[in-house]
């Protein structure tokens, strides 16, 4: 057997010099593995004279324990050093100036839509949606626009080749809702509508909210009270309002609602903001509701119009030009 003392001394020096866990593992295998130096020494004990085996065995076992402890301590030391190095590399300098994060916000039209629908939701109206590609019956005929009715020309409709169309108002949602729900009912429809018109105050695509109430006792006075409450809640102030007689095929009588709007110079002018009226009996008949028993009122508004008034925007097209400098004012 080779000198166990010199083997241990050299092994301890090699362990102390190891600079990585991989090198340390190679040393462990070379010393204590199945074919390692210390293991080989133990296997050779049987070849020694009986009187030498005990002392040699104790020396080898002691060497094995010393090396096992040295390997463990060196491994822990290397792991601590690796952890310290990683923490140093990942350290955050809290004295550095912070970064300004990008800030997102809702589009002003979305904000206005949510404000309008929220107000009517608190008044007990259920929000309903419908398709933007409509058929003629839901968009016109069910709403008392018979074929060749001159009022159809007011809507500047986009037609598809198969006779379908891009809805010109959200009133078709009301038709579908009345077909699926029995009175009494309260609902609002909100979404995009399309008309072939484009200028400072009109867009080929715009947003509309329409409301409908049908029961046995609704009157024009109820309609006026509802709209007065809505205008007050939306603008958070009281307005003088007037209802002017107007024609809409689906209501009778019909009216347009003006509010006394204060100009920047302090003067006041009447500003149209809503259309409304009592639901025409023909519309109720078309959806299977008895007009002798039930009455109802309906109203509608352009969302962009209310957004322009709320945010002081003079050109409707600014909402759809995607100019971040403009939109971030509302974030």
Swiss-Prot record:
Known catalytic reactions: tRNA(Phe) + L-phenylalanine + ATP = L-phenylalanyl-tRNA(Phe) + AMP + diphosphate + H(+)
InterPro entries attached to this UniProt entry: aa-tRNA-synth_II, aa-tRNA-synth_II/BPL/LPL, Phe-tRNA_ligase_II_N, Phe_tRNA_ligase_alpha1_bac, Phenylalanyl-tRNA_Synthase, tRNA-bd_arm
CDD domains assigned: PheRS_alpha_core
Keyword Metal-binding in annotation: yes
Amino-acid positions noted as binding Mg(2+) in the UniProt annotation, renumbered to this chain: 252
Pfam family of the protein (one): Phe_tRNA-synt_N
Top-tier EC class: ligase
Gene Ontology CC annotation, any one: cytoplasm
Location(s), subcellular: Cytoplasm
Entry cofactors: Mg(2+)
E.C. designation(s): 6.1.1.20
Family to which this protein belongs: Belongs to the class-II aminoacyl-tRNA synthetase family. Phe-tRNA synthetase alpha subunit type 1 subfamily.
Annotated protein name in UniProt: Phenylalanine--tRNA ligase alpha subunit
Organism per entry: Stenotrophomonas maltophilia (strain K279a)
């Amino acid at each position: 057997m080779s000198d166990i003392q010199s083997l241990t001394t050299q092994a301890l020096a090699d362990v102390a010099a190891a600079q990585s866990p991989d090198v340390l593992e190679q040393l462990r295998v070379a010393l204590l593995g199945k074919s390692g130096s210390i293991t080989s020494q133990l296997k050779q004990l049987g070849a020694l004279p009986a009187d030498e085996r005990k002392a040699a065995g104790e020396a080898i076992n002691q060497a094995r324990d010393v090396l096992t402890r040295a390997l463990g301590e060196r491994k822990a030391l290397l792991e601590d050093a690796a952890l310290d190095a990683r923490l140093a590399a990942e350290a955050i300098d809290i004295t550095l100036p912070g970064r300004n994060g990008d800030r997102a916000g809702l589009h002003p039209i979305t904000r206005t839509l949510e404000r309008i629908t929220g107000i009517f939701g608190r008044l007990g109206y259920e929000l309903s949606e419908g398709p933007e590609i409509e058929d003629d019956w839901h968009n016109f005929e069910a709403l008392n626009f018979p074929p060749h009715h001159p009022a159809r020309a007011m809507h500047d409709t986009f037609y598809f080749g198969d006779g379908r169309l891009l809805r010109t108002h959200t009133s078709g949602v009301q038709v579908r809702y009345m077909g699926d729900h029995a009175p009494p009912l309260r609902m609002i429809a909100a979404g995009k509508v399309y008309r072939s018109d484009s200028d400072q105050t009109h867009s080929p695509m715009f947003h509309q909210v329409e409301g409908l109430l049908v029961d046995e006792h609704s009157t024009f006075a109820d309609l006026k009270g509802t709209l007065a409450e809505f205008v007050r809640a939306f603008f958070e102030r009281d307005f003088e309002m007037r209802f002017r007689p107007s024609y809409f095929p689906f209501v009778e009588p019909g009216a347009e609602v003006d509010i006394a709007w204060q100009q920047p110079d302090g003067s006041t002018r009447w500003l149209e903001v809503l259309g409304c009226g009592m639901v025409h009996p023909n519309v109720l008949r078309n959806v299977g509701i008895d007009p002798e028993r039930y009455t109802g009122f309906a109203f509608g508004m352009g969302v962009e119009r209310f957004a322009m008034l709320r945010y002081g925007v003079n050109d409707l097209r600014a909402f759809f030009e995607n100019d971040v400098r403009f939109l971030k004012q509302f974030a």
